[in-house]
Amino acid sequence: MKAADGKWYAFGTNGNGKRVQVAVSDDFNKWTLLDIEALPTLAGWETEKDHWAPDVVMRADGKYVMYYSGESKSDAPHHCVGTAVADKPTGPYVPNQTPLSCRLDQGGSIDAAGFLDKDGSRYVVFKVDGNSVGHGGDCNNGVAPLVSTPILLQKVQADGFTPIGDAVQILDRNTNDGDGPLVEAPSLVLHDGTYFLFYSTHCFTDPKYDVRYATATSITGPYHKSNVELVKGGDYGGLISPGGATVCGCGDRMLFHGWCDSSLKQRCMYVADLRLSGTTASIV
C-alpha cells in the first residue's frame, strides 16, 4: 500500500522473529526489510503463533487498519481475521478485541484484504479456510469429499472493521475450473467499471500454485472466472509455486510470493507491473 508519506509498504506473514514483517520502498522495485515488530501486542482471542497474510489500508482520517489471520485460542490451529489500528504505516498496530470473522465451524477465516469502492464504501474480502477441516491430501483437501473454500465479501463501516450486515460469497473452488483443493488470497480492485478479483488456486506447496482472476460489473458479483493463469510456475526465469498476490488500488502494480529457490525452504516477495483493460489482466 502507498502511505501518506508517499512510500510503498509491504506486510508479510510471521518470520525473521516478527509476527508481522514490514518492508518499505520508494519506487515499488527496490525494497528494504525493516527491523520492527508491527504488531507488538495481541488481542485476547489469539495465540502467540502463526500470524498470516497481513494487509493494510489507509483510512480517510489518516489512520492505518491492518487485517491479519491470527490463530484462535478457543479452536487452534484454526484462524480468525483480526484487525488492528495504527497512526503510522509501520505501527505499532493496536489490535481490536473482537475479530472481524472466525467461522471456526467451517475451518476459520484467513487471507483478508481491504477495498475502498468508488462511492466511499469499505469492504473486506477473505477466505473461509475450509481445507483446514478437509480429509487429507494436498493442503488437507485433496481427498474426497472435497470441502468448500469460499471467498466472502464483508461490507464494513468507515472505521474499516465494524461489519455492516452479513458477508456474501463471491467465489469458491471448482474442480471443473482446475482450482485444485482451494481458492485463497483474494485481492480486489476496480478499473473502469470492472471489479477484478485476484486469487490463487492449488496449494502453496504445489508447483501448480498460481495467480488467477475473476471479473464482475457489481462488487457483489456474479464474478466470472477468466481461468487464466496470470502468474504460474516457470514464468519469468523460473518462478516456483507463485501466488498470494496483492494488487495495489491503482491497479497497475502487484506483489506476490513464491519459493526463493529449489530448496523450498523460504518464500520470497516478487513485484510485477500489471495492465488492466476491459475484463483482461496481463503482466507487462
Where are each of the predicted segments found?
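Carbohydrate-active catalytic/glycan-binding domains of CAZyme proteins
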Residues: M1-V284
